[in-house]
Amino acid sequence: MSSLHKFKAYFGMVPLDDYEDEYLDEPEPARRPARPARDSGRDPYLDRDDRDFAEPAFSKAAYAPGRRDDLDDDFDRYDGPRHSSRVEPVAVRSARPSASGAVRGSTRGALAVDTRSERVESRRGPLFDEGGPLSKITTLRPRDYGEARTIGERFRDGTPVIMDLVEMSNADAKRLVDFAAGLAFALRGSFDKVATKVFLLSPADIDVSAEERRRIAETGFYSQK
């Protein structure tokens, strides 16, 4: 059919029967080429297109809970390395006796000696000895401003007073510091800071130097009274 005749048939200028469209003709189903003989070397059981191939049947017994637990046990079970239960003896070194026959090491029990307190005592020196300037010193730890009267009475009697205000709130501690400063000024004494929230009130006849205040702070004397 010529191109002109196809054009006329497309626009209805000629009968439709005379129009033969090769695109409307249904092609014949392609025939599957014959499978060659099993001489290609392929495994016929691996060819899924083969009619002889069949999927293996699903077996519920293989996935039963008991069977699954058996399979898990095969992989979960692990035998760790075995260690010998025999206990090896450990050599114990005995302490060497010193030249005086005493065993080296710290002494425990009733015979123990607190060397730290001895060092503290040695650092105090004559400052706190009997007859020293601070031999009558007293430490007061007020909990509120109501104890200011006790501090004033001790200081009025000529006793040096250490005020430990650590346990007081900041507001009450500030009020007590103002009271002590005014008290020291009125009685011609001195009012000095020893440590954080710790102060020393000294009467007029007792002069405490800066070095002595430093020694009070180092020895922690105010915390032992």
Curated annotation (Swiss-Prot):
It is found in: Cytoplasm. Residues 22-116 are annotated as: Disordered. One of its GO terms (biological process) is division septum assembly. Gene3D superfamilies: SepF-like protein. Residues 28-54, 77-86 have a biased composition (Basic and acidic residues). Its main location: cytoplasm. It comes from the Bacteria. Keywords: Cell cycle, Cell division, Cytoplasm, Septation. InterPro entries: Cell_div_SepF, Cell_div_SepF/SepF-rel, SepF-like_sf. The keyword Manganese does not apply. The keyword Membrane does not apply. GO terms for cellular component: cytoplasm. HAMAP family: SepF (MF_01197). Cell division protein that is part of the divisome complex and is recruited early to the Z-ring. Probably stimulates Z-ring formation, perhaps through the cross-linking of FtsZ protofilaments. Its function overlaps with FtsA. Homodimer. Interacts with FtsZ. Belongs to the SepF family. This is Cell division protein SepF. It comes from Rhodococcus jostii (strain RHA1). The gene is sepF.
